[in-house]
Amino acid sequence: MLKSISILFLAIIMAACSTTPEKKVMIILVDGVPADVLESVDTPILDQIAAQGGYTRAYQGGGKDEYTQTPTISAPGYMNMITGVWGNKHNVWGNSVRNPNYNYWSIFRTVKTVNPEMTTAIFSSWEDNRTKLVGEGKPEAGNFMFDHSFDGFELDTIAFPHTTDRSFMFNIDENVSKGAADYVRTNAPNLSWVYLEFTDDMGHMYGDSPQMIEAVKGMDNQVGRIWAAIQQREREFDEDWMVVITTDHGRSEDTGKGHGGQSERERTTWIVTNQNSLNERFENNPPVVDVAASALRFLNIEAPTEIREEMDGIPFIGDVSIMNAKARIVGNELAVSWDVADKSGSVEIYQSSTNNFAKGEKDEYSLLGKAEVKEGQFKTAFTFPTGTTKLLLKAPHNWTNVWVIVE
């Protein structure tokens, strides 16, 4: 009897001492690699990561010919990813990053605000990702500061002399990927962003070419360094890592040298992840804005309500109820529709006739009505004011939003 009690006591103690693996997220953005090019190149590291989770074609550029349309240019593409919203909200339209709207928080700011104990890091071949897009240290960006940054090497022309063949950018990417791998091994931040540029340089210089193919192979090797460090952390520490690799835009249809427009090839991107709890959203051409929402879900971070109301992305891991919401005016009626992912429960549809959030102020939402998720639609009589009407759909597993604009 005493022996049984001792064994039971030991089991209780061991259970109490066991811990849930600590969540970590690594987001890697490689510049300017269209889906068709990636799929044509031997990338053993990306293939290995996808074998654990999945690979899907995705898209940049927002809704074509819609209010969310965003240029397929680098900085807007990065901002789409780190904020989970399109250009009509974050206001980044080109690489000059003239007037970003920091009221739409980066994922890094959200994580630090909700859980200040979590650590963040950036490893980047373009310093503006930290200083302009995230807005590190800016009052208007909440005075957010990374716990660790490893960037600015493109400004160091002594260590990385600038050459016309752009090989110095490959060397910078090498340095950045090694720096990221080393820091992950020793510090393992909760949320990290790695940015690698050289693939886009080769695309601009040579288009669809052997040089572009070799650049993609080199990128795969660089990702491999980081992946090896993550695998080591998972083996040696009680950690659970989500890895997401994606790109900021495709390339032009004709030569592959350009981008920025809304052609199918410029819009078509991809996502690789090691996660195996992928949902219907992942399998149906997800937008890049889903990356932020997915990372937050993995980290068990719920964004503040006013941020969550604005996010355009939907998690591609775990349960989701609705996606691809659309709204239109039919006579004197408002018609809202959505694609059904999980039929259970109901959708609450709210509206606001203001867009005060864009100015850092609050929008008041009123309930228009409810519908069963499985119905996939909601209609109601509605008098539309001139300007923007914001619609917020709250379903059991996720929220989403859509605008109606009356000129």
Descriptions of predicted regions:
Residues 27, 45, 218-260, 295:
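Metal-dependent active-site segment of extracytoplasmic phospho-/sulfohydrolases and closely related
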Residues 36-73, 121:
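Short, structured active-site-proximal loop/turn typified by the sulfatase FGly-forming signature C/S-X-P-X-R
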Residues 77-78, 82-85, 260-301:
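Substrate-binding rim/cap in mid-to-C-terminal beta-strand-loop elements of soluble/periplasmic
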Residues 88, 92-93, 99-164:
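Catalytic-site neighborhoods of secreted/periplasmic enzymes
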Residues 135-138, 150, 178-221, 225:
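Active-site His/acidic residue clusters
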Residues 245-274, 404-406:
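Histidine-centered active-site microenvironments of extracellular/periplasmic hydrolases
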Residues 286, 299-333:
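Polar, surface-exposed loop/tail segments
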Residues 333-342:
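Aromatic/hydrophobic beta-strand junction motif of beta-rich domains
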